[in-house]
UniProtKB/Swiss-Prot annotation:
Belongs to the tRNA pseudouridine synthase TruA family. Keywords: Isomerase, tRNA processing. Formation of pseudouridine at positions 38, 39 and 40 in the anticodon stem and loop of transfer RNAs. It comes from Shewanella baltica (strain OS185). This is tRNA pseudouridine synthase A. Substrate binds at Y109. The gene is truA.
Amino acid sequence: MRIALGIEYDGNGYFGWQRQAEVDSVQGQLERALSIVANEPIGVFCAGRTDAGVHATGQVVHFETNAIRNEGAWTLGVNANLPDNIAVRWVKEVDDSFHARFSATARRYRYVIYNHSFRPGILRHGVSHYHGDIDADRMHQAAQALLGEQDFTSFRAVQCQSKTPFRNVHCVNVTRQGMYVIVDIAANAFLHHMVRNIVGSLLEIGLGNQPLTWMGDLLALKDRNQAAATAKPHGLYLVDVTYPEQYQLPKLALGPLFMLD
């Protein structure tokens, strides 16, 4: 049978999502816990591979198993065998047409900036700290140039392996909640480091170092070297993945949980 899981994790301390030899990964920890509960080797497929230090509240995975277990075993049982910073949020049996990556029609990320003169203590691994006077309204206005299907070469990592630089951004909003500035962006898919590269450039606009037209200018240049530095990883969360209605997957609060949704 094929099972889908909703996963939440704190990416701090992991070398990203993907299983790698001799380093700790989210995928490796999840597969270990699932294999214990299923009493057989389990391999998982995810909706989107996150980098080192990046978090998720809405990661979706699927796996195949011959084990017959109830919902409690796949949630409480797996959680009991996971580190405290990884948790199963929901479970659902799906038909064989479902694939966590290839069935997805959109992904949504939130980037959380702690905008204060002094760095945070408790949330130091859950937000990215930037001081200076950040104008969120200015960032939001500039970000609208990203909407639609466009060539995002200026915002892709050098090591990005995607065959095409084109992505379709469905919506992007920048808002302020007290000391937090949140960049919320959804697209059909994202290039490697695309969100963090976009945020890095939006910050330059928010700080008044670049004009409102800069995002559009960068898109036209198609040159990563012309854009700003990549934003820090700790503020980035994969918060939602969209699938066709036929799969009836659960929908929970996007998070992260310390924010107003």
